[in-house]
């Protein structure tokens, strides 16, 4: 007998066929499964996500979902809900370089408080924080007119700004109270700010992803289960599998299906038989700002 990679999940479409319980199919993870964040927006539909609104700066200002992104021109667009401190906001965005383009957290961006990546009044990007006093750090013009992954850690005593995974500045500006995620462009027609996706912590401390049922086409002897995952410190991914005769197991302990069996580690042996197989991934984190990312699962069975 020879082990072969037979069935599994490795793409967004694959994972979309499963069932989420406090987990999330994330663009941040290139289509992988993460713990559910407190707020997420993919901007992949035809309209704004539920709970988002537009506030034009002037007549003709717009914010619309176009080609898989939020595109803002002469307006502000943000959540209707406000959130307290102790959060991280991460987003993929592109600034055209026109003055007064901002993405970050604030109440309305007309008055403090705010924490934002901003073009300010020159063709350069800044990290800007403001509560009782403003503070800004010039990041230069190289970050304009191209997509980058931005992160703002809104801590109790400081604000940490990160671009493409590297911390660019820490500002000692304590900000208390409530703010909301906002994307803003200050003038109609002089350039747009584009946000592809947005995510805000805290992540759920635990969650479960249950895969669709895989069909081997006949009774087989299952050999092993392997997975690929990013597991930051304080997080974990665990897998369990079950096999059965029917294509649609019911809840609980369905007839004709084995109990869930934990897989000791990626690539470990699965001593079970049956035509159908299903896996369940348990994701956990004891750090609210971190999540593991499940990127691929492969189930192997014996063939003659």
Segments from the language model and where they lie:
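Extracellular Ig-like/FN3 beta-sandwich strand-entry sites
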Residues: 86, 145-147, 274-276
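Beta-strand-rich ligand- or partner-binding modules
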Residues: 1-61, 68-72, 78-83, 169, ...
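Short, aromatic/His-centered strand-loop micro-motif at the edge of beta-sheets
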Residues: 128-149
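Short, exposed beta-strand/loop patches in secreted or surface proteins that constitute
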Residues: 23-26, 60-66, 113-120, 152, ...
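Short, solvent-exposed beta-strand-to-loop segments that form ligand-recognition rims
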Residues: 163-180
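Short tryptophan-centered beta-strand motifs in secreted/extracellular beta-sheet-rich domains
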Residues: 43, 89-93, 145-161
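Secretory/extracellular carbohydrate-interaction modules
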Residues: 69-128
């Amino acid at each position: 007998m020879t082990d072969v990679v037979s069935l599994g999940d490795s793409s967004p479409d694959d994972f979309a066929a499963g069932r989420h319980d406090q987990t999330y199919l994330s663009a941040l993870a290139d289509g992988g499964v993460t713990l559910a964040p407190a707020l997420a927006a993919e901007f992949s539909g035809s309209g704004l996500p539920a709970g988002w609104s537009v506030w034009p700066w002037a007549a003709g200002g717009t914010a619309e979902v176009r080609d898989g992104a939020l595109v803002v021109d002469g307006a502000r667009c943000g959540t209707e809900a406000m959130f307290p401190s102790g959060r991280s906001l991460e987003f993929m965005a592109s600034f055209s370089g026109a003055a007064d383009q901002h993405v970050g957290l604030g109440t309305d961006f007309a008055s403090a408080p705010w924490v934002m990546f901003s073009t300010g009044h020159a063709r350069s990007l800044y990290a800007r924080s403001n509560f009782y006093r403003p503070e800004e750090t010039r990041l230069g013009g190289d970050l304009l007119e191209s997509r980058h992954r931005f992160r703002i850690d809104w801590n109790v005593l400081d604000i940490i700004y990160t671009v493409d995974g590297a911390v660019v500045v820490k500002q000692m500006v304590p900000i208390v109270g409530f703010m909301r995620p906002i994307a803003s462009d200050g003038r109609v027609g002089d350039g747009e700010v584009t946000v592809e996706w947005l995510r805000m912590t805290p992540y759920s401390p635990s969650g479960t992803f249950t895969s669709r049922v895989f069909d081997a086409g006949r009774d087989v002897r299952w050999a092993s289960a392997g997975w690929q995952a990013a597991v930051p410190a304080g997080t974990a991914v665990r897998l369990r599998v079950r096999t059965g005769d029917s294509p649609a197991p019911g809840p609980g302990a369905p007839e004709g299906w084995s109990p869930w069996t934990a897989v000791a580690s990626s690539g470990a042996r699965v001593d079970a038989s049956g035509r159908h197989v299903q896996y369940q991934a348990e994701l956990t984190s004891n750090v609210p700002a971190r999540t593991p990312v499940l990127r691929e699962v492969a189930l192997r069975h014996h063939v003659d």
